[in-house]
């Protein structure tokens, strides 16, 4: 099975312009993401998908591969669709979509979503990761997306609100969604053609489109948190963790 990992990276960000190139312990963030991803077993190729020449130059400077995407791409999914079309990937090729703001991603987490497709072929459309929340501040923070799943680890819902809600107790696990997906090339083409979902629009969570249209998302639970960098303040947290990693 051919497995291509794509790292979508945009230079423009209202909260953190130039985020992929933000230095973390002397390297641009996108390099940390790329190098950690390259440690995962089972990958055929890794590419950064970007529409910005500055990111392209930075990636090529450390020896990474880049595919340039349409700057008019309306969403991350459209950018991925553009990239896989340019790369000429086949319908049954597996795509791993890793967000470019996860410099602490653990390679084992990437291997987990690949393993789901190897062990359960044809049983679901997408695979993703969750991790149990251990920091209380994250429970009610909308930037940390929560998730619930059934007894077979099929996702039931994703929300910026705390889910599930314990009516009589707060003593129960809550899981956070990690920004990594896996799907076949044929599914992402199908997904890109689906109309915007009502819940997707409310929560501003693209994965809800799949659930709203009846597609299954299989979940693996990771032992490793991989916090995303959303603001310049998050850089200091990453630097501290990388220093002891």
UniProtKB/Swiss-Prot annotation:
Pathway: Bacterial outer membrane biogenesis; lipopolysaccharide biosynthesis. It catalyses: 8-amino-3,8-dideoxy-alpha-D-manno-octulosonate + CTP = CMP-8-amino-3,8-dideoxy-alpha-D-manno-oct-2-ulosonate + diphosphate. SUPFAM superfamilies: Nucleotide-diphospho-sugar transferases. Its main location: cytoplasm. It is found in: Cytoplasm. InterPro entries: Cytidylyl_trans, KdsB, Nucleotide-diphossugar_trans. Its EC number is 2.7.7.90. Pfam families: CTP_transf_3. Belongs to the KdsB family. Activates KDO8N (a required 8-carbon sugar) for incorporation into bacterial lipopolysaccharide in the Shewanella genus. PANTHER family: 3-DEOXY-MANNO-OCTULOSONATE CYTIDYLYLTRANSFERASE, 3-DEOXY-MANNO-OCTULOSONATE CYTIDYLYLTRANSFERASE, MITOCHONDRIAL. NCBIfam families: kdsB, PRK05450.1-3, PRK05450.1-5, PRK13368.1. This is 8-amino-3,8-dideoxy-manno-octulosonate cytidylyltransferase. It comes from Shewanella woodyi (strain ATCC 51908 / MS32). The gene is kdsB.
